[in-house]
Amino acid sequence: ACLVGSEMCIRDRQYLNPPSADKMEKEVGDTIYRVGDKVMQIKNNYQLEWERKSRYGVTYDRGNGIFNGDTGVIEDINFFSEQMLVRFEDDRFVYYDFTQLDELELAYAITIHKSQGSEYPAVLIPMFPGPRMLMNRNLLYTAVTRARTCVCMVGLEDCFHEMAANESEQKRYSSLDLRIQEMDNL
């Protein structure tokens, strides 16, 4: 997974999953989904039905719920039924109606923020200047700890040192403390 500069990495998809006459495609807005593309669920959907099948096609498990950050591969695009079949990494198969495709995005590359809670065999981290509030030690730690076996940083060594030295954290103004106080007053 490429964790930063995801727009640039997605453009390079043509090398990872090039178009061909035998691969169905579905255009949604500015995005073209193609059989074989890696995709990510971008919001929780507790109603979405999934099933697991044996290698012989027999369903042996069913359930509901696909969650933000789940990744998979497009197995089929069917224009007759207006559905796209995605096989998630844990072998859950999900049929998305074409009206639900806004819940997916291409996942050849993802941002560090979207990678939180997930692991990948290898992580490529482009190291280039960015906003100071993002160039901090916590974000660098998050990026590095997403990798199971291999981390490769590409770019400017100064950016690595800047992030490692920057201990600042962006203060969040969520009003959570006020909401908790309101609940205590009930």
What kind of region is each of these model predictions?
Residues 1-10:
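Single conserved hydrophobic/aromatic residue that forms the stacking wall/gate
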Residues 13, 17, 37-40, 44-45, ...:
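Amphipathic, well-packed alpha-helical segments that form the structural scaffold of globular domains
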Residues 15-25, 52-56, 101-106:
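Short, structured beta-strand/loop micro-motifs enriched in basic residues and often containing a Trp
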Residues 20-29, 153-158:
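A generic structural motif
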Residues 27-33, 63-64:
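Short, surface-exposed secondary-structure edge patches
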Residues 28, 42-44, 113, 128-129:
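A structural micro-motif recognizing beta-strand termini
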Residues 31-58:
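Short coil-to-beta transition motif at edge beta-strands of beta-rich domains
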Residues 56, 60-64, 68-186:
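C-terminal accessory regions
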